[in-house]
Amino acid sequence: MKKLDQNQAPIYEALVKLRKKRIVPFDVPGHKRGRGNPELVELLGEKCVGIDVNSMKPLDNLGHPISIIRDAEELAADAFGAAHAFLMIGGTTSSVQTMILSTCKAGDKIILPRNVHKSAINALVLCGAIPIYIEMSVDPKIGIALGLENDRVAQAIKEHPDAKAILINNPTYYGICSDLKGLTEMAHEAGMMVLVDEAHGAHLHFTDKLPLSAMDAGADMAAVSMHKSGGSLTQSSILLIGNQMNPEYVRQIINLTQSTSASYLLMSSLDISRRNLALRGKESFEKVIELSEYARREINAIGGYYAYSKELIDGVSVCDFDVTKLSVYTQGIGLTGIEVYDLLRDEYDIQIEFGDIGNILAYISIGDRIQDIERLVGALADIKRLYSRDGKDLIAGEYIQPELVLSPQEAFYSERKSLTLDDSVGQVCGEFVMCYPPGIPILAPGERITRDIVDYIQFAKERGCSLQGTEDPEVNHINVIKKKEN
């Protein structure tokens, strides 16, 4: 059997070898190594376009890997401490949906927090599983949902012992971590699978100075966004599984929706990034930690802002904190996170990850430099000096957990009618409403629309939040479920 080591990058190496050959392409893609689209070559470069190729015997096939892709997946599994890894070219959206579709069928129950990414609820629409939502605690100052509390999960398991799986966000977008190991043990004792949306935790496994990773905690499946903090290209992801999962069945689930024309640009970026993390991840992410902690100290020294960290840990709803997440509460200077987000981009040419009602997130990773941090800190100080106000008109960014009336699948496929936001109060929602990013639904199909929720949506619109999910692009109307006539 061929011995693999982390210095190798099988897909990348095969592409380099292919480029050295004078192969005449009579296959797709039709740009024929860029000759048919010179503007594309000008944009991306000859080397990039030259390896945008189709599956062929020397390059293996993502749908049924037997050579270099299989080797790359084995190396990824070894690097992340998993039994098996799948290279995913549909983003972590496809990884999250594969986890749910692999463990739940129509009518099955799944225990999960309500503040999941829309991809998880979309998976419930697809498979017909029934969500059992855990009530989330909210930090009263910064207004963000916290982690899963063990007692509440234990109660859900007691009330729904037939649930098939538990889905955990860890870490959250803001850096909040639950008691992942304790929750995993609790679920396994009840015979349930543990699925972890680790989209924002590709870096956790590579240093003991960060919270525990999903695989290290014993989870059954984990969706890892390599492109977020691991250095690969946008839309590339890795799905990790433990020993209890059947990798061939999971592959069949992946192939239900995954493209049969897998991008070798995406796959090679995963391959190279995995090698980088395996060889240099520890030193890289410890540098990221230093940059993040420096930025946090400097921002808090400005006054008005609150860059939070491990002081949030209470052992109940916050059991650890990912300090690489530079999450900053902004309402102390009288501005919403959305407003600060827009000012940073429009006035200072600084693009951060997102802004919500009360917070911003600056994503710090392996590509950041100290001079970039200094520029961000300086801009935030300037924004406070030039734009701060009393903030009396602000509403709290408190997370609102809607009442579930119908399953997401039943609601999504029900007859619907369009109402204005104000007229929709009391109705059952038939579509998604969310700020993006982060892509956590304010409303999802099957949930009761309340006055508080409508007020939140209208306030977010007024402050410039990018709302999506509704059929109406302006989000002045919302589709609700038509009531059945007797």
PLM region spans:
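Conserved N-terminal alpha-helix of the aminotransferase class I/II PLP-enzyme fold
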Residues: 49-94
